[in-house]
UniProtKB/Swiss-Prot annotation:
A GO cellular component annotation in the UniProt record: cytoplasm
Source organism per UniProt: Cupriavidus pinatubonensis (strain JMP 134 / LMG 1197) (Cupriavidus necator (strain JMP 134))
The protein's name: 3-phosphoshikimate 1-carboxyvinyltransferase
Family classification: Belongs to the EPSP synthase family.
CDD domains the UniProt entry points to: EPSP_synthase
Taxonomic lineage from the root: Bacteria, Pseudomonadati, Pseudomonadota, Betaproteobacteria, Burkholderiales
Length: 434
């Protein structure tokens, strides 16, 4: 197996220009495809997940071209030209979920599949929501999971659509992004969220981007959303993709652990991504944080003992970046408790289980529950001979690069899995650490 040995590292300092946000990139691509006219997308993330979306759109007859680092998408006006297709979605949840909803309203015959892990990631709550409006979606293997078969259907909306919010916010995002294409007798479509909505900041991203494409959704708390029916998606002409706030977390944590200053550029106070609030968590742990509209900078703690300190944090607002805190906890005095992280279990891998397993290999004491993780740093650091497993999960690989600030080298297995969102991560990380 391919692996990469890092550290031990003692210092982190420098500036990182972040790659584009995955969450924003795939949302923008689909909205541009549904809009009329051309949309120039600047700073799009170049990664496995965005390539999956671009290839799917091309298969569906949506034209796009690349000009330098820009992508120009020629929208379909809400009607994909190709009405029968088989689409391979890799392990891209941000692609398969909204596309499933969009295709259910297209009146075509489509099959969607992915890698084996994708076929273990739930999609049943979204399918249930779409079936409420008459969509014809069948499971080709296990009930509630891809692969899927979508057939032509008569879509009718005469009652509120109910969707669960406690498994993944991507189900609600998919409905919000695509239901404006549908017709409703009174011109409005109501979506009711059942249970507590997790990962609310990702819904904020969705609503913000919909508004950029001319779709204004009325939000009543986090329980009810009113979507305009039969709406026209209007291209903004040009749209910039912010830097990825989840990817920023590794460098900001490195600044906190390795002294800093480490500055990330591409996200800041004006960001629409919830994960920028990761910097607040580092500040609570004792790190020094500064920020502007488009940058964040972190230095180490000024405490007498030079250490960060453990915190207890409800992570609903930073679900992806919270993983980075679990590894940063190795360098904090006391125990760090991360709660409200149930969504980790249905991501690229079961991230609660995977994180607990790999932290223990380094000597940490870890308690895991259905939706929480408690991490106490190692009394004695260990170097696992078999390395750190990454579970084909880009965020596991990037998180555990921070373990190289410990007193022993750390071996990261399958480092290439970072291609999902940040192909040159380890080169960039190496540029600001020593």
């Amino acid at each position: 197996m391919e692996h990469l040995t890092l550290g031990p590292l003692t210092r982190a300092a420098g500036t990182v220009r972040l790659p584009g946000s995955k969450s924003i990139s795939n949302r923008v691509l689909l909205l541009a495809a549904l809009a009329g006219g051309e949309t120039r997308v600047r700073d799009l993330l170049d990664s496995d997940d965005t390539r999956v979306m671009l290839q799917a759109l091309k298969t569906l007859g949506v034209a796009w071209r690349q000009e330098g680092s820009d992508y120009i998408v020629t929208g379909s006006g809400g009607n994909f030209p190709v009405k029968a297709a088989e689409l391979f979605m890799g392990n891209a949840g941000t692609a398969i979920r909204p596309l499933t909803a969009a295709l259910a309203l297209q009146g075509g015959d489509y099959k969607l599949s992915g890698v084996p892990r994708m076929h273990e990631r739930p999609i049943g709550d979204l399918v249930d929501g779409l079936r409420q409006v008459g969509a014809d979606i069948g499971y080709l293997a296990n009930e509630g999971f891809p692969p899927l078969h979508i057939r032509p259907a008569q879509i009718r909306i005469d009652a509120p659509i109910r969707v669960r919010g406690d498994v993944s916010s991507q189900f609600l995002t998919a409905l919000l992004m695509t239901l404006p294409m549908a017709q409703a007798a009174n011109g409005k479509i109501e979506i009711e969220v059942v249970g507590e909505l997790i990962s609310k900041p990702y819904i904020e991203i969705t609503l913000n981007l919909l508004a950029r494409f001319g779709i204004n959704v009325e939000r009543q708390g986090w329980e009810r959303f009113i979507v305009p029916a039969g709406a026209v998606y209007r291209s903004p002409g040009e749209i910039y993709v912010e830097g990825d706030a989840s990817s920023a977390s590794y460098f900001l944590a490195a600044g906190a652990i390795g002294g800093g200053p480490v500055r990330v550029e591409g996200v800041g106070m004006s960001s629409i991504q919830g994960d920028v609030r990761f910097a607040e968590a580092l500040n609570r742990m004792g790190a020094n944080v500064m920020a502007g509209d488009n940058w964040i900078e972190v230095r180490g703690t000024e405490r007498d003992d030079g250490r960060l300190h453990g915190i207890e944090l409800d992570c609903n607002h930073i679900p992806d970046a919270a993983m980075t805190l679990a590894v940063a906890a190795l360098f904090a005095g006391g125990t760090t408790t991360l709660t409200n992280i149930a969504s980790w279990r249905v991501k690229e891998t079961d991230r609660i289980s995977a994180m607990a397993t790999e932290l223990r290999k380094l000597g940490a004491t870890v308690e895991e529950g259905a939706d929480y993780l408690k991490v106490t740093p190692p009394a004695q650091w260990q170097t696992p001979a078999d390395g750190i497993g990454t579970y084909d999960d880009h965020r596991m690989a990037m998180c555990f690069s921070l373990a190289a600030f410990g007193p022993l080298p750390v071996r990261i297995n399958d480092p290439g899995c970072v291609a999902k969102t940040f192909p040159d991560y380890f080169a960039v990380f190496g540029g600001v650490t020593r």
